[in-house]
Amino acid sequence: MKKKKFTFWKLLLILLIIAVIAAAGLYIAVTHYVSKLNFEDTSGEDNFSIVDSLADGATGVKNILLIGVDNDYAPGMDELGNADGLMIVSINPKTRQVVLTSLMRDIRVQVPDSYKTKLTLSYHYGGTQQLIDTIEYNFGVPIDNYVLVNYISVVNIVDAVGGLTMDVTADELYWMDDKIRSVCDLVGASYEDNMLSTDQAGELELNGIQTAAFLRIRYAGNNDFERTERARRVVLGLKDKAAAMSLTELDSFANTVLPYITTDLTQTDIVSLLLRFPAMIKYDMISDRIPIEGSYWFTNDDNGSFVDIDYDANKEHLQSSIYGGELS
C-alpha cells in the first residue's frame, strides 16, 4: 500500500510540475506577443453601460470591434483618418457562433451628448472611444474591445498568410486598378508587379497589396453595400488561413503582424481568447450587415449624403443576431 501511495503522490507531483511549466510557458509566450502590439488603454474612459439593458442572453458573449482606418500611417500615430471599415465580431459560446456584422460607414448617427454625423466621422472627430460610445449609444450593444488596422496593416497581414483566394468580378478588377496604384505608392512597391486586368476575372490568389485594393473599392456592384461584404469575405479568408497553420507558422505570423495592430485587449483577454481558440474555430460563422434590407433610405442635405435607418428595426435585428434571439 505504501508503495502505491508513494507512486500516486509522485505522479500527482509530476503532473503539477507539468501544469506549472505549461502555465509559465503560456505566460511567457503571451507576454512576448503582447509586447509587439500597439496597446491603447481605454478602460479608464467614460463608457456607456449598455450591458444592464440586455437580458441574461448577453452573458458570456464577447463583442470585438474591428476598425479599418484610411489614415495611411502605422496604427498608433496621431493621424486618425476615417473609420473606413467597421465590423463587430461577436463570439457567442452559448450558440457556438461567431457573428460578423458590418456597419455601413455612412449611417447617420447621434454622437452621445453632441452632434449628428456619419458613423465613419465619429472616429475622425473623436477617436476610438467616441466611435465605441457612438455605436453603443445608437445600436444598443456593448463593445468589449477593439482591434484597429489600416491598409499598411492589411498588406502585411495578408502577405504573412501567403495571400487570399477571392472570387473577383471584372467590375471589381476595373475599380481595383487605381486602388492598386495608390497602395503601391503607399508601400513603395511596383505597380507592374501587382497589376491585374479585367480579363482575369474569376478565382484569384490576391497578395496583400491587391487585397488592400479589393477592400478599398466603393463603386463596384452595389457600392458600399458590397464593400462591406468584401470585408467580411477577407476576414473569413484570414480565419481559414490561420486555422490551417502549424504552431511554427502561427508564431511567425504573430511576430510579423502584431506590430501593425492597435488594440485595447489586455494580456488576460488574449490568454482567454487563446484558450478558447481551438473551440472557436469550429463555431458557425455568420455574416451580417447593418442596416438590414428594407430598413434604410438615402438622404442628401447641406451636411452631405447619409444612409438614414430605422433604428428600432436594426437594433432589434442586431441584438437578436448576436445573442441568439434569446433576449427579452
Tell where the protein language model's regions lie, with residue ranges.
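Amphipathic, coiled-coil-like alpha-helical scaffolding segments used for oligomerization/assembly
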Residues: Y125-A189, T266
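Soluble non-cytosolic domains of exported or imported proteins
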Residues: E79-A83, D113-S114, S122-Q130, L148-I152, ...
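Extracytoplasmic
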Residues: T59-K62, G81-L86, T95-L103, S114, ...
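Second-shell loop/turn segments in exported
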Residues: Y73-M77, T117-Y125, G140-N145, A201, ...
